[in-house]
Amino acid sequence: METDRDHMEEDLGQVAGVSDRGQRHSRNEDAMHFAVADNDDGPVVVAIVCDGVSSAPRPHDASWTAVQAGITLLAEGAGQGDDPREVSLGAVRAAGQALTELAGPDGAPATTWVSAVVSQREITVAWLGDSRAYWLAASPARPVGPNDTMDITGGSRRVSRDDSLAEEIVAAGLASMDEALASPQAHVITRWLGADMPDPEAHVEQFSPAGRGVLMLCSDGLWNYRPEAAELASMAMPAALTRPLDAASYLAKFANDSGGLDNITVVIIPFPPRSDAVPASPAE
């Protein structure tokens, strides 16, 4: 059984996270879990963030059950050096099966899902719903001349793409993102993890960063206030590279100070994972 979830912090050195109830909700329906595995190449970080679907029954149970069911498979696969794509999809299926077993007369609990496997050379992200993964580059690129059009975000970007009505409207060419987000139905998700979603196959993206940075997983309680990767990078850096808990705490506080209209979860994973990284404070 989980402990009090109104405010949770955890720091493993190579990864840290904060999950908070926010200002408006009576309980925290988000959940996070992460671990560090070791294989022949060095430490591998695995992490999951889930946001229980409030319109379904027992959303707090759904998110917690999903992260608990998925993290063991992620950690075991990473430690054995298994294909991270297959490991990620297997974890999603295990979480989906666990949620199927939660279904009852009151309906089918459901949750979003975003997970990561972060090794020394590669990052694998899997997702369903609108919980997000961002790559935040360590420093912005610098233009070399007045006419240079170099991307000054330095490669910071959103890795995941929401399974939401807003994204579908934009993809269909029916509206701009700003116009789509103005709709009261913008945040309606179109795919999720639960017994009533017949196709739980997650999206997967793999990439190899060219330099240092952090992978951030978060629920919409944060990105509703700062959706752009470059802005998030400017807020998180440089603390996120060596003090991930400080960065996660700062971003969670920012979301709370901005209104805290939803539950807030932020997980920060510096890349590449360092074997000498230690928690900011002794574990409880």
Residues of each region from the PLM?
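PP2C/PPM-type serine/threonine phosphatase catalytic domain
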Residues: 1-284
